[in-house]
Amino acid sequence: MDFSVGILEFPHVAEGYKNIDYIMKHFSISTLKLHRICPGRLLFIFSADTSDVVNIMKEYKDNKRKILYSSVTGISEKCIESLSSRNKVDDFSDLGIVEVKNCVNTIKVADLILKTSSSEILKIDMGLGLFGKGLVFFIGSISNIKAAIDTINDNFSKEEIVSTEIISNPVDDFKKLFCY
């Protein structure tokens, strides 16, 4: 089943909380992430039926308060799960990392990895202390990770993707940063 995701970035934290309360009172949504981000902004990521996401985005389209908004449709359920929590793993042999220019494309990259490869999303970091950038950490065989990165490079521009890396056979102390 596919979902839609809405992303709102408010220029003021207090104003953001007030808007989120309004959205929750008027629409059926699930909160995926809510973070204060640099410099003094509030990032809100939620999932909902496509019609609700579209209606929420319409409300902010004409807003003159410099609220950044975007939506992504057709997101896999596994990607939604990855947005709201880390994947718990005991061990892995290879790690792929994609650094993305913004939150919207971070979600699209994670979804593309899940839909086009046998890799698993380990963790998605967005916005927090990253000035809007995102990181997707994913695991799989070296060949799956390379194929996923090739697919990402084929589907995104160099302006959208900051960098990609593959870490093969990381040491155990490094793995502990990701394993639970």
Indicate residue ranges for each PLM-predicted region:
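Conserved short beta-strand edge segments in small beta-sheet-based binding/regulatory domains
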Residues: 64-77, 158-169
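C-terminal binding/interaction regions
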Residues: 25-30, 44, 122, 128-131, ...
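Short, low-order "capping/linker" segments at domain edges
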Residues: 79-96, 173-180
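Short amphipathic beta-strand starts and helix->beta connectors
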Residues: 22-32, 82, 115-124
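Surface-exposed interaction/gating patches
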Residues: 91-127, 132-141
